[in-house]
Amino acid sequence: MSMKWTSALLLIQLSCYLSFGSCGKVLVWPTEFSHWMNIKTILDELVQRGHEVTVLAYSTSILPDPNNPSPLKFEICPTSLTETEFQDSVTQLVKRWSDIRKDTFWPHFLHVQEMMWTYGDMIRKFCKDVVSNKKLMKKLQESRFDVVLADAISPCGELLAELLKIPFVYSLRFSPGYALEKHGGGFLFPPSYVPVTMSELRDQMTFMERVQNMIYMVYFDFWFQVWDVKNWDQFYSKVLGRPTTLFEIMAKAEIWLIRNYWDFQFPHPLLPNVEFVGGLHCKPAKPLPKEMEEFVQSSGDNGVVVFSLGSMVSNMSEERANVIASALAKIPQKVLWRFDGNKPDTLGLNTQLYKWLPQNDLLGHPKTRAFITHGGANGIYEAIYHGIPMVGVPLFADQPDNIAHMKAKGAAVRLDFDTMSSTDLLNALKTVINDPIYKENAMKLSSIHHDQPVKPLDRAVFWIEFVMRHKGAKHLRVAAHDLTWFQYHSLDVIGFLLACVATVIFIITKCLFCVWKFVRTRKKGKRD
């Protein structure tokens, strides 16, 4: 570790002593790629505030790289899977998801479930390697952590918290069909006005759209499983030595930090232990590298367009690249395109290719006019933060849903990556750049995002510290977690009331019958 980081850690430790033991110890169960980027923002802030943060990473981790200088501590757990094998597996999953036809409901989500199970099997293997490593678990026990911070999309963090007997906090963007949020967190999503995730619907639904949304909800609630829950339940029961389920352990989460906010999400009810922290990674733009700044300034009053399909897409076909390049060549703006491939034949003089872009800094530049994006939540939040209208070209996962949200809010135009023509892309760019309503709507979302009493990052850190200070947040946990499914839906109460009504009706009917019989008998006696 460099002298710089050593000095920083010494200062942090000194601040802990001076603050009378207010510093805590945080154990982190991370997830790869953009999930890690978000959670690392929280971890860096926790370290800045004097807390000791330990990241539990498996030896094949891609982004949580313990070899990079960092104030974070890393505990590495060996696993039989190599980094190359893991990265190839993830790349194949992304490619398969991108290739699934989205216009066929059942096959689409059956493939999604299959891929989620494949990913879940890898995570379960990593989890087994951790909890079966007696030396590592003993070290974690002796470290006396105050809280576990985990991404709910990768199970195991809650199991570690249960084994270590400490509270845990979740960070989560979403799960397909809100499955984890509903079954593990008890969240409420009325289907009459809350569209199911990945449905690409908006909150203002027609009757037939509400029918469609109800079908989605029933499918995700009773058929679709994010993970192979049966195997996870058996695994957790075996490790803990008692019958339990994955969702039963997930329900013990003290706080859910959802990476969303009302500038992005449609309004819906929230539980007391749920906090929105969307855009926590966003920050003011920094100066661009000299050569890039010169290129941006050369655009004059026309400005620039920023184009990025994210870090997980690097296999664009030559045909698609040429379709895109020819459209970009026809606009008056200069274009900065993140592209890792052979230079397209139709590339215009106004377009520069880069293997990496300082995306946030470009979106915050005063000359940026539009953002062509795949619809990743991180990129969309940076565009919202800086008030930049978007052309959405979603590829997989939550991206189509994200772009549907931005389109509903009037800040984006959507295109289909596989079928769009050069003319389609050109017209979409002209629309979001020349029609002022898109810029106005983007700025409105930006204003909403900035007008919060507490910044998202500060809110996330506050609640983690709150859980450490109070050894949990049980006072925010709804009693619904302690009810059976029929108690939750008051079916036992409804059954009891129906039985009471039926009993009263039966008694009244019997009484009336007896009175009728008595009267009839008396009349017959008088005749005799």
Swiss-Prot record:
Residues of the signal peptide: 1-21
Presence of the UniProt keyword Membrane in the record: yes
EC number: 2.4.1.17
A Gene Ontology cellular-component term: endoplasmic reticulum membrane
Subcellular location: Microsome membrane; Endoplasmic reticulum membrane
InterPro entries per record: UDP-glycosyltransferase, UDP_glucos_trans, UDP_glycos_trans_CS
Highest taxon in the source lineage: Eukaryota
Similarity comment: family membership: Belongs to the UDP-glycosyltransferase family.
Function statement: UDPGT is of major importance in the conjugation and subsequent elimination of potentially toxic xenobiotics and endogenous compounds. This isozyme displays activity toward several classes of xenobiotic substrates: eugenol, 4-methyllumbelliferone, p-nitrophenol, 1-naphthol, p,p'-biphenol, naringenin and o,o'-biphenol. Active also on 3a-hydroxy and 17b-hydroxy positions of steroids.
Official protein name in the record: UDP-glucuronosyltransferase 2B19
Naturally occurring in which organism (per UniProt): Macaca fascicularis (Crab-eating macaque)
Upper taxonomic lineage: Eukaryota, Metazoa, Chordata, Craniata, Vertebrata
Gene symbol of the encoding locus: UGT2B19
